[in-house]
Amino acid sequence: MSSLFVEGMPLKSANESCLPASVKQRRTGDLRRLNHHRQPAFVRGICRRKLSGVSRIELRTGGLTLPRAVLNPVSPPVTTTKKRVFTFGKGNSEGNKDMKSLLGGKGANLAEMASIGLSVPPGLTISTEACEEYQQNGKKLPPGLWDEILEGLQYVQKEMSASLGDPSKALLLSVRSGAAISMPGMMDTVLNLGLNDEVVDGLAAKSGARFAYDSYRRFLDMFGNVVMGIPHSLFDEKLEQMKAEKGIHLDTDLTAADLKDLAEQYKNVYVEAKGEKFPTDPKKQLELAVNAVFDSWDSPRANKYRSINQITGLKGTAVNIQCMVFGNMGNTSGTGVLFTRNPSTGEKKLYGEFLVNAQGEDVVAGIRTPEDLVTMETCMPEAYRELVENCVILERHYKDMMDIEFTVQENRLWMLQCRTGKRTGKGAVRIAVDMVNEGLIDTRTAIKRVETQHLDQLLHPQFENPSAYKSHVVATGLPASPGAAVGQVVFSAEDAETWHAQGKSAILVRTETSPEDVGGMHAAAGILTARGGMTSHAAVVARGWGKCCVSGCADIRVNDDMKVFTIGDRVIKEGDWLSLNGSTGEVILGKQLLAPPAMSNDLETFMSWADQARRLKVMANADTPNDALTARNNGAQGIGLCRTEHMFFASDERIKAVRKMIMAVTPEQRKAALDLLLPYQRSDFEGIFRAMDGLPVTIRLLDPPLHEFLPEGDLEHIVNELTADTGMSKDEIYSRIEKLSEVNPMLGFRGCRLGISYPELTEMQVRAIFQAAVSMNNQGVTVIPEIMVPLVGTPQELRHQIGVIRGVAANVFAEMGLTLEYKVGTMIEIPRAALIADEIAKEAEFFSFGTNDLTQMTFGYSRDDVGKFLPIYLSQGILQHDPFEVLDQKGVGQLIKMATEKGRAANPNLKVGICGEHGGEPSSVAFFDGVGLDYVSCSPFRVPIARLAAAQVVV
């Protein structure tokens, strides 16, 4: 018999986990009768029903006997939005897992766990719609909501046979936030609500003074910080001062008398900090706590987190009110957090942490560094066995890896929360592949399970040679989020953001992170903390972003004021270089070399499923043979954009030849300079054709304005350098620069306008393309060249350039004795071209939308100057996204849709794609698939992301 606590009342209950399977199976026959004759569902630190075995039947898997939940009837989703409070308790729920938008992720999953018979503390969930009404009502509870909350509270009190504020049979509550999308640590939680001087005395009489006053001082601290806005540090100072006076290091070493005295000191903090006393009325406490959770939805840290993670369209947060269970009732109690599989690697093994004699926030907040879950198996074997069983049940029910919070009170297990677990890219891919192999999910579900950001993480670098830095390892913490990070040390979130804005790589070093640090955590290359476990705030947030993190590094001492941290006698100061290995927890002095990651077998398997599912082809933007090889290795199906101008910067000889061409006055001078460039271009094209053997290569003719090839600096410096490069006199240079100067070069002398004005420029580039194509074909390479004319705004421009291209092609084929098939098309990047796409399509064999310039010209935003006002537009909600990163579907997107439809109407064989960086942005890819484009083209490193995004559109 284990002693359990029912809100101030110690109870005894049998441990059903010890019952023989035959007894449990017989009890299932009583299910219907018991459902009509329910006993109180004692929860969260309260005992289960004596016959709780009825909620399970045995499932034999090989030699292992595992329990399986029997699904009790679940209430269908509520169709009216008028209901704002939903109750739940073991075997009964007014909600379910499909109601996340209304109940939040936490509330929906609590309802679901209760419905399938797991031991969940009874409670109630206030809907996200109520939060929205609260915000619209001037941050006041909307009419009638408080009465609905009290009605829900009556249900909980009846289930518990306890009352809020009754010292003899007190009901204590937790009040937690829970949005539809998980936002770890961003919103607020209050535990042990309902305590005051009278209630704590009653609690002490029944459950022990130390436990009672430990709960009280925790509540005073948390309520003061979350609800009253009192800095946590003011309470922490009192705690640390008392521990110093007593000569102890751990909170658990404080006596009952110490904790009672500490509670009095905490109450004084209210008066000192706020000028008002701690509110003793439990219902007033509850009302204030609900308000605080609703307020936390609109807090700066929550807003920043949603902005960083592009979370939009949510109504607000739900509020979950549950009766408390206690992990701080001694050495037979504890609390923990676990994942049903390793979230970093995906390994099928429980991954979590456990703290004996502690409450849940101690683990999540990183206040104490917890121990491995194995500790629980050793000291609480029965509770651990049931926990393992519950993990199996939940994975089979949700068909996903789950993140679970639990408490053990006097050897009794209570499930406090479950949600889909956040995972790294590596973990996501392995979990998806393993679950397909296990028969839990199909490949289409697996494709939806891996986010495009997960693949982005897998493309991040690792250390080039881990063995080379071993002598520089100065400390080892917990490997909280894998990958490698190299940067300069900073000690505040603000500094991390500042350094990032300056183009510097920063490592954020903190004693422990808090939700206020999210901006700096996002800006930093990596995160190092002295405290906190694998499920601390820093670890969870970093893993969600694929950010390298080492947590709980007990060897370091952080001094924020001095901007240094120490490891023994070694001092590391702000600006020093540091490297982190988030996969091993190693902290390494200096700037270590990084190397790109290699694709794993799991990733190759997963990407093959994505490729089978998608319709849209994925090409790459690549300008060099190395870029082309990288693109092919990442799964590109061709080159959608090869920018010839980038080749000109590859060497001093090339750029000097380009400058001679620009400075040329006569066609003869210009041709002489171009003849110098031709072998360079031909060599580069040969390398690209070789790398893309058998795949199409789309080469764009010269596009940028000529000034981009001139030296930087003041006019005198430019003239001196051009004089040296070209051999012309200064007067000639000055005269030529004056003639070439433009007020707005991005709308001036560039693109096809260059090729029309200087046909010899187009001739040189096309000659280099076809000479390279024939040469490679003669070497056994299958070459599929496509030539793209940029910045076309009229069909006449395209017709002119096609004439030049076909003339040169005929000459080269005649000279080299071989004819190859090729295509000629154009970029659609001027709004006028989109409007008359039907006319242009009569000349072109393919369209490629240049969404960078099309966005620039449609909005009238200069890409070079948009940084001056775009942050203001985004912060004020004038724009929801940077249109150069996320396609403007209502404006630019409609031009693309119209041009595609008109172009294909005029030329049914027209191939249509997109080659701006939008080609690698998932929501943009979904749009391109929807309007029927044939392909997208993006940077080589974003090719896997585009492949997955294209697959997710159709599954």
Curated annotation (Swiss-Prot):
Compartments, record wording: Plastid, Chloroplast
UniProt keyword terms in alphabetical order: ATP-binding, Chloroplast, Kinase, Magnesium, Metal-binding, Nucleotide-binding, Phosphoprotein, Photosynthesis, Plastid, Transferase, Transit peptide
EC code: 2.7.9.1
Cofactor: Mg(2+)
Regulation: Activated by light-induced dephosphorylation. Inhibited by dark-induced phosphorylation. Both reactions are catalyzed by PDRP1. Very cold-tolerant.
Location of the transit peptide in the chain: 1-71
Residue sites binding substrate per the record: 643, 700, 829, 850-853
Catalytic EC class: transferase
Residue positions, PTM Phosphothreonine: 535
Top-rank taxon: Eukaryota
Further remark: The reaction takes place in three steps, mediated by a phosphocarrier histidine residue located on the surface of the central domain. The two first partial reactions are catalyzed at an active site located on the N-terminal domain, and the third partial reaction is catalyzed at an active site located on the C-terminal domain. For catalytic turnover, the central domain swivels from the concave surface of the N-terminal domain to that of the C-terminal domain. A short cytoplasmic isoform may be produced by alternative promoter usage.
Function field: Formation of phosphoenolpyruvate, which is the primary acceptor of CO(2) in C4 and some Crassulacean acid metabolism plants.
Protein name: Pyruvate, phosphate dikinase, chloroplastic
Species per Swiss-Prot/TrEMBL record: Flaveria brownii
